[in-house]
Amino acid sequence: MTPTPDYPFIRSMPVLDCSDITVSIAFWRDKLGFDAATWGEPPTFAILQRGTVSVALALMPKDKVAVSHNWAAYLYVKDVDALYAEYEARGVALPHPPETRVYNCREFVVDDPDGHVIAFGQVLNPDPLGPGLGARIGRDQKAVS
């Protein structure tokens, strides 16, 4: 196995394709409470941020249709129930209330205007290996590389 370099990854940012970036920016800003920085006039790219979480939006070509029906992004928060209540008050369509999962997270999902499924989750008992990984890696199993 090749050794891992000493410099750590800092963060990741999902990049979501959008058919109408103006509508998507408005949804993320007005409904989900993110700040937006845009590029182009009219915008063709945006980076949205709330706290330390960033999500990018990219205007997709008219002939491209690529939407995952699984999670497009999983965003970790400190209080998932409070966030759910905030989004409920903002009128966000919420398919179900937060649920506690077997992988030690409490979560709910929203669909953005392009059908991207965005999950918001709270780690219930933090593990040094990261959310969900402690149960699978380290104690009696090895990470796959």
Question: What kind of region is each of these model predictions?
Answer:
Residues 35-70, 117-122:
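Conserved short beta-strand elements that form part of the metal-binding/catalytic scaffold
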Residues 41-44, 102-106:
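Short acidic/glycine-enriched loop/turn segments that link adjacent beta-strands
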Residues 11-20, 46-49, 64-90, 106-111, ...:
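Vicinal oxygen chelate
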Residues 1-23, 71-73, 123-145:
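N-terminal beta-strand motif that seeds the catalytic metal site of vicinal oxygen chelate
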Residues 22-36:
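Amphipathic alpha-helical segments
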Residues 63, 102-103, 123-127:
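A short acidic/small-residue loop/turn micro-motif
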